[in-house]
Amino acid sequence: MRIEQELKLGFKDVLFRPKRSTLKSRSQVNLTREFTFKHSGRQWSGVPVIAANMDSVGSFAMAKALAEHGVMTAVHKHYTVADWAEFVKSADKATLNNVMVSTGTSEADFQKTKDVMALSDELIFICIDIANGYSEHLVEYVQRVRAAFPDKVISAGNVVTGDMVEELILAGADIVKVGIGPGSVCTTRVKTGVGYPQLSAIIECADAAHGLGGRIIGDGGCTCPGDVAKAFGGGADFVMLGGMLAGHEEAGGELIVKDGETFMKFYGMSSKSAMDKHSGGVAGYRAAEGKTVLLPYRGSVHGTIQDILGGVRSTCTYVGAAELRELTKRTTFIRVQEQENNVYGRE
């Protein structure tokens, strides 16, 4: 047993230090990033925010809506190949180029991924997603998927330390997904005692990935636009959002009317709700590691994504970053004990 003494930080522990800026307006800030990925050689241009691959967030409807803003969607893995075929027929190139095809690591998952990717050459992203990215099986699976899809962009995770980021990139991942337990409906840290404060995880994993020419996704922990900006400031190339995009018309969650008000069900993908729906219940050898909540129905996602991107633009103006890619270079975080004045409640 050993104890690491170095302080680890989450988004709530810091604020950006403002810096002199030549920008006159938020409209001058460019949030578009351009990446050339390490293994596939693919080039991609867009706003590097991703809707999470949860079945009450990462829907086909969400993908079409967010593509209008240049934003990506990791479509959840519970759609059938037939569902994908219908989506591919109805979606334009810009939408398909901004979609990640999510998969687990079973033999059935591999075959399904092959079937889905064969539907269109415009599907270029594969998201290999398991809760514990420290498994040797994941490394082997990444190698297998890379061999089968040499020209596709492969994301794999989730992990929170630089050593495993490096191993996954060397195995063939272009992007590594970073985050264990920070999500709004995730209870892994409570059930297992395992985790890592998300901002420190992003900072350390970004350093490891960029040294090898890889990229990272900061997955989870964002509660407001300022947190999204902090993730980018910490070095995340992409930021994945679940709870911030849940509850919207496009999210695909179950609508429930209670006492005359409309709510949408939102749950973690290791929750009892998810396992009852997709796995026939919680297996006898495991515990549920997610919660189920009812969110007030929020209408269309377009206003919310504009608010998120507007917040990030404003961050950039405060620190003098004319482009999103400059934000991490312009970032100085200060440690704080308070974030905001809550005398009239939280926004």
Curated annotation (Swiss-Prot):
GO terms for cellular component: cytosol; GMP reductase complex. It holds the Pfam family IMPDH. CDD domains: IMPDH. One of its GO terms (molecular function) is GMP reductase activity. One of its GO terms (biological process) is purine nucleotide metabolic process. Its EC number is 1.7.1.7. NADP(+) binds at residues 108-131, 216-239. The keyword Cell membrane does not apply. PANTHER family: GMP REDUCTASE (PTHR43170:SF5). Catalyzes the irreversible NADPH-dependent deamination of GMP to IMP. It functions in the conversion of nucleobase, nucleoside and nucleotide derivatives of G to A nucleotides, and in maintaining the intracellular balance of A and G nucleotides. This is GMP reductase. The gene is guaC.
